């Protein structure tokens, strides 16, 4: 388990360990759970860590928030070279499943159509259009996964996860315009997934990798939208949501919440549900049920992991002390 001290890594370690799996964590932080302290850029360390394991779940990465603190070479070293080190070590060790946790940020500029265009319907077939070094290096790492699978027959599943971080939004206008939990519940309609559902997708990917050989999947909460909603979503998102969930306005009003005026993209998880048998639980409908009952819509696992931030030193909204979990 690379990145075993991160949001997803720690969640996976907790769940897998509780179920009796023997988990070896690899993380830069000395507090890494159950594991080895070090970098995936260290090829010899990676090979020692992978020896004897049945599966690799690769969550370690430089994220989008690191763009402001790390240069492009650092992104290439960690996200590309580090991933290649893991892939080659896993292939040499005869590992039975390699799960690469990627990101919907690989789609890049394809996610933001022109203002007068319908919302983008994002499936795995949409070609990536690089927007920043984070997305570019994650796309390159995905290509390496496919290459090593084809050359070495390493069973490899790529999970392009949407937002699951608990930190506040990085856009000033969003933080100023929305309560944090309000925004995250809205995002379940089209671009967010709960941490618990990401964990279940990873577990299924490990179990299905051998049969699949190779696969690339979007991991996001199941959207209620359909292609015929895309035009209206750009300028009349509240009316679309109202037709699908007539009760949402009253539930939101009790909290002083509001819906986004415009939605620019919709992530489609149909392939993951079909191929992996994935059944995400935490969608917008579930959130409304929780809010109606006076309960938190986030999973106990997500609440238990909490906010970690992305930097050891203060770095704006990405610093643990400056964030809010809602």
Residue locations for each model-derived region?
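N-terminal Rossmann NAD(P)H-binding glycine-rich loop of SDR-like oxidoreductase domains
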Residues: 1-19
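NAD(P)H-binding glycine-rich loop region in Rossmannoid oxidoreductase-like domains
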Residues: 32, 38-78
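Glycine-rich NAD(P)-binding loop of the Rossmann-fold in SDR/ketoreductase-type enzymes
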Residues: 41, 55, 74-82, 128, ...
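Catalytic helix-loop patch of NAD(P)-dependent Rossmann-fold dehydrogenases
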Residues: 77, 112-156, 184
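Conserved Rossmann-fold NAD(P)-dependent oxidoreductase catalytic core, especially the SDR/UDP-sugar
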Residues: 84-131
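Flexible, glycine-rich beta-alpha linker
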Residues: 107-108, 133, 151-175
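Alpha-helical substrate-binding/gating segment
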Residues: 167-183, 188-218, 222-224
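Mid/C-terminal beta-alpha module of Rossmann-like enzyme folds, strongest
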Residues: 200-260, 269, 274-275, 302, ...
């Amino acid at each position: 388990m690379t990145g075993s001290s991160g949001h997803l890594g720690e969640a996976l370690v907790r769940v897998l360990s509780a179920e009796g799996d023997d988990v070896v964590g690899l993380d830069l932080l000395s507090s890494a759970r159950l594991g080895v302290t070090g970098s995936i850029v260290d090829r010899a360390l990676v090979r020692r860590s992978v020896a004897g394991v049945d599966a690799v779940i690769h969550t370690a990465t430089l994220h989008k928030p690191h763009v402001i603190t790390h240069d492009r070479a650092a992104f290439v070293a960690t996200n590309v070279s580090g991933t290649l080190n893991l892939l080659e070590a896993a292939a040499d060790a005869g590992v039975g499943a390699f799960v690469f946790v990627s990101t919907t940020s690989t789609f890049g500029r394809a996610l933001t159509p022109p203002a007068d265009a319908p919302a983008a319907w994002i499936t795995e077939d949409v070609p990536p259009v690089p927007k920043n070094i984070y997305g570019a290096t994650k796309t390159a790492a995905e290509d390496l996964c496919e290459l090593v699978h084809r050359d070495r027959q390493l069973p490899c599943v790529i999970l392009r996860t949407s937002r699951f971080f608990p930190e506040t939004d990085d856009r000033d206008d969003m933080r100023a315009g929305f309560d944090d939990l309000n925004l995250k519940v809205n995002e379940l309609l089209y671009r967010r997934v709960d941490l618990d559902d990401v964990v279940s997708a990873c577990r299924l990917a490990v179990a299905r990798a051998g049969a699949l050989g190779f696969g690339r999947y979007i991991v996001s909460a199941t959207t209620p939208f359909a292609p015929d909603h895309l035009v209206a979503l750009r300028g009349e998102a509240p009316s679309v949501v109202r037709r699908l969930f007539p009760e949402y306005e009253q539930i939101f009003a009790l909290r002083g919440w509001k819906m986004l005026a415009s939605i620019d993209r919709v992530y489609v998880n149909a392939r993951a549900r079909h191929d992996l048998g994935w059944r995400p639980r935490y969608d917008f409908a579930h959130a409304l049920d929780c809010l109606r009952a006076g309960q938190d819509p986030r999973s106990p696992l997500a609440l238990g992991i909490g906010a970690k931030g992305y930097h050891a030193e203060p770095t704006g909204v990405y610093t643990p002390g400056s964030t809010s979990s809602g």
